[in-house]
A protein has these predicted regions:
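Zinc-dependent deaminase catalytic domain
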Residues: 1-178
Length: 178
């Protein structure tokens, strides 16, 4: 099921029971003051933002949340492999460079190059630590997934990726013209 058009609040009639749950925030009149309720996409992107606060990268802090039928099955953030020194501890060659020193269009996945990055991306960490099958999930990410993460998400059966300002459906995840 698409997280943006579910059946309400996990089985109860939290949105009034009339039609699909909204994917964008809406205002509900409660007593004397209106309450703004975020849509599912906004809600899970907000959680991904909170997850990104755990990232150990000096350059980019990215969070990801894998969701199946409005239930979180995994979270992940970018950083070194568990138990390994991370960027904040000075272990990342890319993290030791100033922004002007990072080679333009460098391959951050090639060890020994000046732009090499030790981080495992947030999406991959979420996939690695998922507690359930990821087929049919939506990935909520704080930044557009890179090509490698798009491939990993598609291979894991993720059917949709959402980030602030954009989204890919199952076919777009592996459409390299995008």
């Amino acid at each position: 099921m698409d997280e943006s058009s579910g059946d309400g609040d996990l089985g109860n009639e939290g949105h009034g029971g009339e039609g699909p749950a909204p994917s964008h925030s809406h205002t509900v009149q409660a007593s004397d003051s209106p309450i703004t309720v975020p849509g599912w996409d906004e809600y899970f992107l907000g959680i991904a933002t909170a997850v990104s606060a755990r990232a150990k990268c000096m350059r980019r802090r990215v969070g990801a949340v894998l969701v199946h039928e409005h239930r979180i099955i995994a979270t992940g953030y970018n950083g070194a492999a568990p138990g390994r020194p991370d960027c904040l501890e000075g272990a990342c060659p890319r993290g030791r460079l100033g922004y002007a020193e990072v080679p333009a269009f460098s391959d951050y996945d090639v060890p020994g190059t000046p732009g090499f990055c030790i981080a495992i991306h947030a999406e991959v960490n979420a996939l690695l630590f998922a507690t359930r099958d990821t087929a049919g999930c939506t990935a909520y990410v704080t930044d557009q997934p890179c090509p490698g993460c798009r491939k990993a998400l598609a291979a894991a059966g993720v059917v949709r990726a959402v980030w602030p300002g954009g989204q890919f459906d199952v076919d777009e995840l592996v459409d390299w013209s995008r």
